[in-house]
């Protein structure tokens, strides 16, 4: 079985940061990425379980996967790829 989180183009460590910092860092990082690239976000703020999916919907990025069963949470976002 392949781990979807294994080979992102970029990784963002947001451990220890609290709202709104993780989403602000995601936005800044995604700005410097090419369409189609993937970003692995690692966070432990419970607000990210709401904020990261909301950011993806609002900014037309695709949330490929999320693992929020325990901390640290992991999210895999694909830039500029609106969910179908």
From Swiss-Prot:
One of its GO terms (biological process) is tRNA wobble position uridine thiolation. Interacts with IscS. The keyword Cell membrane does not apply. The active site is at 19 (cysteine persulfide intermediate). Pathway: tRNA modification. Gene3D superfamilies: TusA-like domain. Belongs to the sulfur carrier protein TusA family. This is Sulfur carrier protein TusA. One of its GO terms (cellular component) is cytoplasm. Its main location: cytoplasm. It comes from the Bacteria. The gene is tusA. Sulfur carrier protein involved in sulfur trafficking in the cell. Part of a sulfur-relay system required for 2-thiolation during synthesis of 2-thiouridine of the modified wobble base 5-methylaminomethyl-2-thiouridine (mnm(5)s(2)U) in tRNA. Interacts with IscS and stimulates its cysteine desulfurase activity. Accepts an activated sulfur from IscS, which is then transferred to TusD, and thus determines the direction of sulfur flow from IscS to 2-thiouridine formation. Also appears to be involved in sulfur transfer for the biosynthesis of molybdopterin. SUPFAM superfamilies: SirA-like (SSF64307). GO terms for molecular function: sulfur carrier activity. Keywords: Cytoplasm, tRNA processing. Signal peptide: none annotated.
């Amino acid at each position: 079985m392949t781990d979807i989180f294994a080979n992102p183009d970029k990784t963002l460590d947001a451990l220890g940061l609290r709202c709104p910092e993780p989403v602000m860092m995601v936005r800044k990082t995604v700005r410097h990425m090419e369409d189609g690239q993937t970003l692995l976000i690692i966070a432990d703020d419970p607000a990210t379980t709401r904020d990261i999916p909301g950011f993806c919907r609002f900014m037309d990025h695709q949330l490929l996967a999320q693992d929020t069963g325990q901390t640290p949470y992991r999210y895999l976002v694909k830039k500029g790829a609106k969910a179908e």
